[in-house]
C-alpha cells in the first residue's frame, strides 16, 4: 500500500475522523465500507498514538469539540444531499438558495471549532480562513 505521510493539524485529523464516522453510519455499500473502515482505523490509531504520547489537559474539552464537529458535519451531509436533490429536479429556487447559504454558515462554525481544537492542542499547523464578511 502506498501512502503519503504529511503533518496535519489536530483539528483536521478530528474533522476527517468525524466525517469517516458519519460515512460509516450512513453508507451501506460493503465495498465502500471496507475503505471507510480501513481509513477510519488508520486515523484513529494515529490519534490514539498522539493523545497517548502527550498529556492533553483538555481531554474532555477535546471530546466535546469533536462531538460538535461531528454534529456540524452530519448537518452538512444532509444539506449537501438536499442540494443534490434540488439539482436533480432543476429546483434552484428559495430552498436551494437557503441550503447553499447554510453550507457557508455551517462551514464557518466548523472552521471555528477546528481552530479551537488546534489552539487547545497547541497544534503547530493552523487552518487560516478569510472570507468576505456577511
Which residues fall in each region the model found?
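Extended, charge-rich alpha-helical interface modules
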Residues: 1-134
Amino acid at each position: 500500500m502506498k501512502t503519503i505521510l504529511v503533518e496535519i493539524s489536530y483539528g483536521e485529523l478530528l474533522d476527517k475522523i468525524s466525517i469517516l464516522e458519519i460515512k460509516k453510519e450512513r453508507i451501506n455499500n460493503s465495498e465502500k465500507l471496507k475503505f471507510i473502515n480501513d481509513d477510519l482505523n488508520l486515523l484513529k490509531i494515529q490519534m490514539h498514538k498522539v493523545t497517548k504520547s502527550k498529556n492533553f489537559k483538555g481531554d474532555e474539552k477535546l471530546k466535546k469539540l469533536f462531538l460538535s464537529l461531528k454534529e456540524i458535519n452530519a448537518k452538512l451531509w444532509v444539506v449537501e444531499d438536499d442540494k443534490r436533490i434540488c439539482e436533480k429536479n432543476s429546483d434552484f429556487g428559495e430552498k436551494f438558495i437557503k441550503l447553499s447559504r447554510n453550507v457557508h454558515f455551517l462551514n464557518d462554525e466548523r472552521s471555528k471549532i477546528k481552530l479551537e481544537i488546534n489552539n487547545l492542542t497547541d497544534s503547530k499547523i493552523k487552518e487560516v480562513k478569510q472570507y468576505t464578511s456577511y
